[in-house]
UniProtKB/Swiss-Prot annotation:
GO cellular component terms, A-Z: cytoplasm
Localization, UniProt: Cytoplasm
EC numbers: 6.3.5.3
Keyword annotations of the record: ATP-binding, Cytoplasm, Ligase, Magnesium, Metal-binding, Nucleotide-binding, Purine biosynthesis
Binding site for ATP: Y50, K89, D488, G525
Function of the molecule: Part of the phosphoribosylformylglycinamidine synthase complex involved in the purines biosynthetic pathway. Catalyzes the ATP-dependent conversion of formylglycinamide ribonucleotide (FGAR) and glutamine to yield formylglycinamidine ribonucleotide (FGAM) and glutamate. The FGAM synthase complex is composed of three subunits. PurQ produces an ammonia molecule by converting glutamine to glutamate. PurL transfers the ammonia molecule to FGAR to form FGAM in an ATP-dependent manner.
Top-rank lineage group of the source organism: Bacteria
Main location: cytoplasm
UniProt source species: Paracoccus denitrificans (strain Pd 1222)
UniProt pathway: Purine metabolism; IMP biosynthesis via de novo pathway; 5-amino-1-(5-phospho-D-ribosyl)imidazole from N(2)-formyl-N(1)-(5-phospho-D-ribosyl)glycinamide: step 1/2
Entry similarity comment: Belongs to the FGAMS family.
PANTHER family assigned: PHOSPHORIBOSYLFORMYLGLYCINAMIDINE SYNTHASE SUBUNIT PURL (PTHR43555:SF1)
Protein name (record): Phosphoribosylformylglycinamidine synthase subunit PurL
Length: 723
């Protein structure tokens, strides 16, 4: 088959800038073949190379005594004691989910699960952080339905409980939804599998499902802005099969017990290209692939298509040669393909052969570790506009503006479509704070949360970055967990615009400072840039996935308020309304600075709560919606009313950081007050749970009326009642 001629248009269609193409010519000393152009395009795009963010990502704290493996592998690995480790990562599937919501979201789940079990871990939990456009936008309901169905269909069939996440709506996501998928698994800490190849002449083995044309060019598409040609990109979205993935999991874990695996890597973005290059580059080796041996489900596939296909449920492995028969038998038992498609070589070459023709012969290291890296110009985000004087609003009317919005209404419609209990170890389902999953057969548990407030990050990227980490820290400590480590999913617009690059730089600086101050290192992550449509960028959305350890489930804080319990706030309340949920929902404005995060107070208050968790019935962090929304959510979940003493809007709805709302008995409250005074921790009694009404100062409404609004607003705003 004749390959296309290399033209300026073809180079541009592959997402390569003229100076990058010039660099390719200098590296190889000739014009690339069509297949080579595709390989460079895939490896040098933002999705695979992190060329715009790498400089700043290096500044993040990634180590600690608990960290076994930080960024650079398929997922991060953290010690949880007793010879066990938790393996986790968060990754975006934004562009595919906008083009084809069901399959885009489903394969996002599949990809992150493979990242985890590639390391030798059995997945035990998933989460999803979702951002959509305005509820009234013509595409939003379609996207919400498709994405939620896709996540549920894949995760439920695979058999991993979905224990948390976020769902938000904002006009900036109208043309570019975000789907950030998180997965965590358990492994023996001395049996972690890595991706660096070793040994010359070792067989390179293809495992799993067959290769088709789905997803060809997916990584390049994920590194571009959208425009009005978006519907034409549908073929670049992959198609997932969770049953095959489940078989692949079991086959891989079985194989890993046999001392057969030298290295292993899942085939994700850029498929066979990226997995082979990363394995070779990390091991300082070259790779030769013979594509005639690649299992194919379509006819007449070209080398270009096979190298760039993103067909799902596939892995690449470097195998001990003497173990071939044993390994093949395992994969055939699970009805999966097992094919030797190449070998490791000593030279720094990526050699691709198809039909006895050399289709690509490139210096392998130049594709990965020596890929372009940019120090892009950036401008700091200017100070946010000052808060205008707000119109008067009654406290209950203010609460209704929040719970009547899909951003803060009950999200049961979403998580009731997910299997939250499969595996029988889920201790705390989605809905109130962090999800909690027992470490099977033990009294230990792991807590999981995902957090970010994009309004804050836009107004003040540095403080917004700090706050995302601090909120994850609080959500973990609020359930009694010791925060261990984080994964970050940095979703931003076009980094070639200095103001967008400034958002990214500011957020990374804030994230780094918070992670360092809280001993909460980043061990894995993902960067998704060019989240723009027709030149309009999303709110900067650096999602933080946090993982914590509950050493003994007796220390879990996960009850509900009881009749007569006191409501107390740990931490200082100043009444900060800038960029608050109330101002956005009740008045439709986004103004003022983001709340500033005192990391010393965050740590002190979090450690105080963990130390005295036995005294409280329940704890929740105070963030979006402040005290009023948190108190209502706890009361509503318990089927109780709540009375807060203050009627002052700033006291009720302010979003000061480093705060928790706790419920406890009169007797325990006295002990908590005494302990707080001794520790120098601010603690204030703010009200009481009980009765059948929600009252703020003298303003009240029946709990039943508010509960009906809270539990119906999500579906009504999106016309999902009949979905």
């Amino acid at each position: 088959m004749n390959e296309p001629q290399i033209t300026e248009e073809l180079i541009a269609a592959h997402g390569l800038k003229p100076d990058e193409y010039q660099r390719i010519l200098e590296i190889i000393g000739r014009e690339p073949s069509f297949t080579e152009l595709g390989i460079f395009s895939a490896m040098w795009n933002e999705h695979c190379s992190y060329k715009s963010s790498k400089k700043w990502l290096r500044t993040l704290p990634t180590t600690g005594p608990q960290v076994i493996c930080g960024p650079g592998e398929n997922a991060g690995v953290v010690d949880i004691g007793d010879g066990q480790a938790v393996v986790f990562k968060m990754e975006s599937h934004n562009h595919p989910s906008y083009i084809e919501p069901h399959q885009g979201a489903a394969t996002g789940v599949g990809g992150i699960l493979r990242d985890v079990f590639t390391m030798g871990a059995r997945p035990i939990a998933a989460m999803d952080a979702l951002s959509f456009g305005r509820p009234e936008h013509p595409k939003t309901a379609h996207l919400v339905k498709g994405v939620v169905e896709g996540i549920g269909a894949y995760g439920n069939a695979f058999g991993v409980p979905n224990v948390g996440g976020e769902v938000r709506f904002h006009r900036s996501y109208d043309g570019n939804c975000l789907v950030n998928a998180f997965a965590a698994g358990l492994a023996d800490s001395d049996k972690i599998f890595y991706s660096a190849a070793s040994g010359v002449g070792m067989p390179v083995v293809y495992l799993g499902a067959k290769t088709g044309r789905d997803g060809v060019g997916g990584a390049t598409m994920a590194s571009a802005e959208f425009d009005d040609t978006i519907e034409e990109k549908r073929p670049t979205v992959q198609v997932g099969d969770p049953f095959t993935e489940k078989c692949l999991l079991e086959a891989c874990l079985e194989l890993m017990q046999t001392d057969s695996v030298i290295s292993i890597q899942d085939m994700g973005a850029a498929g066979l290209t990226c997995s082979a290059v990363e394995m070779g580059d990390k091991g300082g080796l070259g790779i030769k692939l013979v594509l005639d041996a690649v299992p194919q489900r379509e006819t007449n596939m070209t080398a270009y298509e096979m190298m760039l296909s993103e067909s799902q449920e596939r892995m690449l492995m470097v195998l001990k040669p003497e173990k071939e028969a044993e390994a093949r038998a395992i994969f055939e038992k699970w009805d999966l393909d097992f094919a030797i498609v190449g070998e490791t070589i000593a030279e720094d070459r990526f050699l691709i052969v198809h039909g006895n023709e050399v289709k690509a012969d490139l210096p392998l290291s130049k594709l990965s570790s020596s890929a372009p890296e940019y120090d892009r110009p950036w401008t700091p985000t200017p100070a946010a506009a000052e808060m205008p004087a707000l119109p008067a609003i009654a406290p209950i009317a203010a609460l209704k503006s929040l719970i009547g919005s899909p951003n803060h209404a009950h999200k049961g419609w979403v998580w009731e479509q997910y299997d939250t209990q499969v595996g029988a170890d889920t201790v705390r389902r989605p809905g109130l704070g962090a999800g909690v999953v027992r470490v099977h057969g033990t009294q230990k548990a792991l807590a999981f949360t995902s957090d970010v407030t994009p309004r804050y990050v836009k107004a003040n990227p540095y403080e917004g970055g700090k706050q995302a980490v601090a909120e994850a820290y609080r959500n973990l400590t609020a359930c009694g967990a010791l925060p261990l480590a984080t994964t970050d999913n940095l979703n931003f617009g076009n980094p070639e615009k200095p103001e967008i690059m400034g958002q990214l730089v500011g957020a990374i600086k804030g994230i780094g400072e918070a992670c360092a101050a809280l001993d909460f290192p980043i061990v894995s992550g993902n960067v998704s840039l060019y989240n723009e449509t027709d030149g309009k960028g999303i709110l900067p959305t650096p999602t933080i996935g946090g993982v914590g350890l509950i050493a003994d489930l007796d220390d879990l804080i996960a009850g509900l308020p009881a009749e007569g319990d006191l409501a107390l706030v740990i931490g200082e309340t100043r009444g900060h309304l800038g960029q608050s949920a109330l101002v956005a929902e009740a008045f439709g404005i986004e103004a003022g600075d983001a709340p500033h995060v005192d990391l010393t107070a965050e740590r002190r208050n979090g450690e105080f709560l963990r130390a005295h968790g036995k005294l409280v019935s329940v704890a929740t962090d105070l963030s979006d919606g402040g005290l009023a929304l948190a108190a209502f959510e706890l009361a509503e979940a318990a089927g109780l009313g709540v009375t807060l003493d203050s009627a002052e809007i700033a006291q009720l709805f302010g979003e000061d950081q480093a705060r928790y709302l706790v419920a406890c008995s009169e007797e325990n409250a006295a002990q908590l007050v005494e302990a707080a005074q001794a520790a120098g921790v601010p603690l204030a009694r703010v009200g009481r749970f009980g009765g059948e009404a929600v009252a703020f100062g003298g303003d009240a409404a029946p709990l039943a009326e508010l509960s009906q609004l809270y539990r119906s607003a999500f579906e009504k705003s999106l016309n999902l009642e009949l979905a």
